[in-house]
UniProtKB/Swiss-Prot annotation:
Organism the protein comes from: Gallus gallus
Major place of residence: nucleus
GO biological process terms held by the UniProt record: intrinsic apoptotic signaling pathway in response to DNA damage; negative regulation of Wnt signaling pathway; positive regulation of DNA damage response, signal transduction by p53 class mediator; regulation of transcription by RNA polymerase II
PROSITE patterns for this protein: BTB, ZINC_FINGER_C2H2_1, ZINC_FINGER_C2H2_2
Location relative to the cell: Nucleus
Tissue-specificity statement: Isoform 1 is highly expressed in kidney and lung. Expression of isoform 2 is higher in the lens, retina and stomach, and extremely low in heart, muscle, kidney and lung. Isoform 3 is weakly expressed in heart, kidney and lens.
Protein name: Hypermethylated in cancer 1 protein
Domain BTB as annotated: residue spans: 63-126
Superkingdom, natural source: Eukaryota
Similarity remark: Belongs to the krueppel C2H2-type zinc-finger protein family. Hic subfamily.
The encoding gene: HIC1
Amino acid sequence: APGARPAASRERGHKSREERCGERGAAAGRRARGAMLEAMEVPSHSRQLLLQLNTQRTKGFLCDVIIVVQNALFRAHKNILAASSAYLKSLVVHDNLLNLDHEMVSPGIFRLILDFIYTGRLGECEPGGEQSLGAVLAAASYLQIPGLVALCKKKLKRSGKYCHLRGGYAPYKLGRGLRATTPVIQACYSGTPRPVDLQPVEPAAPLNTQCGELYASASQGTPLHPHGLCPPERHCSPPCGLDLSKKSPTGPSAQLLPTDRLLPAEPREPSLPPRHDSPPVSGGLLAGHPAAYKDSPPGGEPGGHPHATDPFRSTPPCAEPPLPRGDGRELMYRWMKHEPLGPYLDEGEAEKELEREEKAESPPAAPQPRYPSVESNDLEPDNSTSEETGSSEGPSPGDALDRYCNHLGYEPESLGDNLYVCIPCGKGFPSSEQLNAHVEAHNEEELYHKAAAEQAVPFLDKGGAGLGDILRPYRCSSCDKSYKDPATLRQHEKTHWLTRPYPCTICGKKFTQRGTMTRHMRSHLGLKPFACDACGMRFTRQYRLTEHMRIHSGEKPYECQVCGGKFAQQRNLISHMKMHAAGPDGKAKLDFPDSVYAMARLTADQLGLKQEKAAELLSHTSHFLSDPKAMESLYPLAKFTAEHLGLSQDKAAEVLAQAPHLHADAARTIERYSPP
């Protein structure tokens, strides 16, 4: 018994050690499980991933989309663009080749934006400071990149050059941010507008905060006008900023008192387009088609009217504007419609404005119809006041295309995903119906300008023109045809733009469908997005790849219904069917080439005889199929024999396999047997 106690104690001690080991193991397991459940993170993972993608982009590795900006090409990845830009997301879904509006984004600005998308860092702008930063801000708003928009606004606020527009003052939706000669950004108006003798305006629709800034003139250290505008007595540089004269399509419209009478606004020379018979001018930018990087001429040059885009002037309730008009202004009034302006200045200020315009030394130029805006029921549709003029070097093809879209004030943000894009002007639309209406309006606007110009100077520069040019002075801009009157010319030119509204931006060739134009542009850029998985060969079209894959699979889906021949490509079958063209008597003919062997040729030739004779000839053929190439003609001949001799295809093949050898002296063109 005494000896058993130590054993029992040892056993108890042994169990206690096992228990302790088990407890330690359980604790270690719990700690391991706890460590596994804890979240782990590599802080630099996302940055390293973007850096790798950016390296791939610079090398063109796995890039699946090309962005064309003017003459510059940028390769990128669709996933990255779609995750960064709502506008680009709607485009990369459908196309591998994107054309951005060069009036909205310049190649240099887009390079900065693309670097920001891949790195999250905005590089140093070119010399110009806030001017370039303003262009980046406008382009980022156009491309709908909220992170870059916020970064640009933050930088501008730090420098004190940015003021945010507050909603509720005017019944307008903001247009696009536009840049003037000097990049100082000021508020459109500060404080509460002075009361005027007008009816109160209903609350406005929410303003678009992405474009809530004005790129105004350099007036450092000078307080703003009570309405946020340059007073008439200050000859400041043109505030080519946001076009606030465009009414919201769904918002309330301003109304005047019943005693007020609408007056035609005095035509402003800076907002007029350049013509071939007037000196080129440069000034404000088109609100519906803004250019965030196009400079305006410095100072008070013609085309840089300080209030060319001022939407806040009120028309004084007087009978006629107190301005004498010369021949140039009479010509302008033939082109322009009456335009009631916004109720934001009183009569005295409006009169000062008119007097200042009278003293302005700017050459008259032919105006251009502006954007129609939605007014109240008792007002006729009027036009806004901001538009783009040509550069000092004369109108370019891009400027001509800009004039096509002057009838619409388009805001991409209000239309969501714009999947239908007008190629000439770059505007996007949510439906094909709106795009078709827009393209038709393109043509009407173009013809309106052409017809009006021809009416103004019908025989300009004719000099020693012949009698035909005098009798038909209206010439088509797309072809050499000329007509007696502009109405006939208008009907003719519709055949150019309405049937082929999509021109190639590289060579100018026009197409009826946007997809056809995109595929055509791939030939210029060498794009072959469709690759064969078996051999790696690449193609520009999907159907070409499908045809190529049949080489690997051996599939021949196209069968000749006359002789039973099979082909991998449809065009080969079409070419083959030409051999079976009907003869003078209407019977189908079989024209076999020299590569078809003697048995097939001779047998088919003799099938033009009676049925018994054909069967006899087939039974005498033998040992002709020793050449493997002759097997290619076995199935067509068997099918042909079965159809005309009443045999099954298996039986016909058996007879042909046992046929004796015959010589190959037979005609190539024979008539198929037709039962009596």
